[in-house]
Amino acid sequence: ISICRFFSVPKTKNSDKPVENPPDLSGAGSFFIPFGSNLPEIDDINFHRGYGIWGAIDRLGIPKFLQKDKNKSIGFLIAHGEVLPREKNSVSLSKKTDEWGIPIPYIEFEWSENELNMAKHMENTIRKSIKAANGEMKNIDELMNIPLGSLFTKNLIALSDSPPPPGYYIHEVGGAPMGINEENSVVDKFNRLWRCK
């Protein structure tokens, strides 16, 4: 399950300093904050497993003329949480086939109370992180001058207040549960497929 939020923070004295060979967005120009729910000092957790928050500041390559406040840096935080395996969530093959005759996957999946509780915690952690950095959480059209921008951004699923549907951020939805036998799992405790010898 994932939550995406944009924000602005005051620029630092080095914010506009040119960077030689700037890193790609998904590389060294971003950061990752892990959050484990099994830490002993955490007492307000009502979900299992954990999540991490991926983010960056001033790495989106937004031209200055599009920025509403030139004295602020624009950043994003995207929290990705672990989804519990449940028998109800499944992938099966449809009787329908694609243009090459291959059966189309049929995915049955929904968030459980665990993931929805985690999403609320992720949202709260993102808010606290932005506040700790003296920043403000804002919608993307509050940060940038995009002609007719709100017409495009108001319906973007990733920018909505609630978590996007399962599979929107593809890496949060697993499909091969680990278990003790082939009847209830795809892989064994060593992550080996039951059906491969």
Q: What do these predicted ranges mean?
A:
Residues 118-122:
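Hydrophobic (often cysteine-bearing) scaffold residues that line and stabilize catalytic clefts
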Residues 1-117, 160-177, 184-186, 193-194:
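FAD cofactor-binding and catalytic pocket of flavoenzymes
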Residues 130-190:
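An extended, acidic, His-containing surface patch that forms the Zn2+-binding/catalytic region
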Residues 123-131:
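Non-transmembrane alpha-helical segments in soluble domains
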